[in-house]
Amino acid sequence: MQVAIVKYNAGNVFSVINAVKRLGIEPLWTDDAEALAKADRVIFPGQGEASHAMSYLRQRGLDRVICDLKQPVLGICIGQQLMCKHSEEGDTDCLGIFPMEVKRFQPTRHEDKVPQMGWNSINVNGNGNGNVNGNGNGMFNENEDVPSSARLSTYGAQENEDSNSGIDLFKGVKEGDFVYFVHSYYVPLHEEYTIAMANFTLDYSAAIHKDNFYATQFHPEKSGMVGQKILENFLAIDN
């Protein structure tokens, strides 16, 4: 299997490369349109600023390339945000794969510090609270011990037997498992496209899915065995 990782001006790429290597696959880090189109799977990762990232993608024609991909594609962190229609960060028009508008967190409590940085549970029961007790804001720092369970559920999308269901991304992940977040902006909930949600000052999309496009706000490559399972699930999704 050929896994391509989109090469652009975003950080945190090498942790994704190493995570894929741990699964026994040597990924291709590339900005070549033909190589991306021919890959069996494409990962669109990164941390960065939306307007700078979109400017880079447009200058190299990668915006059109990504939108035209037919194989399973996984956006991570800013990759998820750039898949949306627009971002408040830099008042940026994005790829428009998903219709949502990316918003900045506006915390109302002193203890809610932006960016959200740490371990948080993803919630899929629709009960509106993915947080658990940790460092005072419902999360655990990267160097803290992470509890084994909280709440995990799917939001919006219906669980079914289809091999291309968004639920496939979470197969084998235990209810309430924790994942790692670092972000100041969020994708709002959407009844059709949100497949997992989290809570930090409000409920938002922790993962979204449309056709062959999957995306997570959290970092599976930094989320231990849970994140590894999610990456395994993505690589196993039928084309």
PLM regions: where:
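Structural motif
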Residues: 43-45
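Structural alpha-helical scaffold elements that stabilize or flank donor/cofactor-binding regions
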Residues: 35-36, 65
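Cysteine-nucleophile active-site neighborhood
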Residues: 48-123, 232
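Amide-donor transfer/coupling interface in amidating biosynthetic enzymes
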Residues: 68, 102-239
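Extreme N-terminal starter segment of soluble prokaryotic enzymes
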Residues: 1-4
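An anion/phosphate-binding loop that grips the pyrophosphate of nucleotide cofactors and donors
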Residues: 39
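Generic structural signal for residues in well-ordered beta-strands
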Residues: 26-27, 102
